[in-house]
Each structure stands twice: as C-alpha cells, then as structure tokens.
Amino acid sequence: MAVIDAPFTSFTPDLPRLNNPGLVKAHNCSAGLGPAPGTVTLFPLKSAALYSNTSMVSRPLGSAIGMDRDGNAKVYGACATKLYKLAPSTRVWTDISRAGGYATTATQRWRFVEFGSLQIATNFNDEPQQINMNVDLQFANLTTLVKGRYINTFKGFVLLGYTQDSLDGIVNYRIRWSGLELPGDWTFSPAT
C-alpha cells in the first residue's frame, strides 16, 4: 500500500466549527510530537497484527482484564460453554471453567467485573462465576441463590441486575446486591 503525504492544515478541534481554518476531525491516525516545539504531527495507525493463533471452541462472548496483587496482568475470555485465561508466555487460551461447563444461549453474553482480587462473571443462564486472580486456577460459583444478566460494583457491593432467583423467578427490573465487602454473601434479608 502506497503512503501519500498530503499537506493538511493544523488540527484545531477546540476552535468553533464555523470558519475553522484547520481540521476538526481526524480518523485512523494518532497524534505525536511535531517537528517544532508546540506542534503536533498526525501519524497513521499501525495495522492489525496476529497476537495469538489459538482460538476458543466457539465465538467469544465476553472478555475482561485484571491485575493480581503482584501487578501481573490477567486476561479472561468466555464463549458459550467455557471460560478461559490467556497465558502470557504462550499466548494460548487455557480452559479454566468450572466442572460441567456453561450453557450461554445465543441471545446472552458474558459480563465481567473486578472486585478486589476477584474477577466475577455472569451470563444470566448460569450461576455467577468467580476466580481469585492471585491464584488463577479455576472459576467457581460465586452464589447459587441468584443469577443476573448485568453486573457491577458500587461502594463495596457487587450488584446483579435483571435477576432470577427461587423466590421471584425472572424480574427484569430488580437489582440484588451482595453483603458489604462480602461478594459471596447473597442471603436475602427483608431488612435490606
């Protein structure tokens, strides 16, 4: 592919759009230091490159990154039936699913959230899953009391939204939360 140098004016997205003498949008490029002090040069984006030639058993349906207590990056991925971690030295997806696997339907996907040293995942069809990123061996059930389509954290709580439990079945407008700083405690209490 040939590279063509085209003289463009300066990149001035902070000026008003009307009668702006410079560029207000620049696609497929990244900014870098220019040849003179205070100037910016736009460089083309690097092309995509193969990072790993391994794959999951089916289409990826979610991924997450995290960090263990030693500062090592952790990469997790999910498909319909398995949860994986990416081994940094070999760049190979390793199956670390619970025994029995998972049953993610075609309309669902995996959603992840980091809580302390835990990486927590949910797909609504199976129990929420957790893995301690410091140990990093195998995912296990976070709880069997509630399932959720959406997951997040807020001030020491793990929240599940669009829930399913044995008391009320599927309730798309309900949010359930764990105990304070206890992501594995999902005991229902009328007081909360």
Protein language model features and the residues they cover:
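A short local loop/turn or secondary-structure capping micro-motif enriched for an aromatic residue
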Residues: T94, A103, Q129, D168-G169
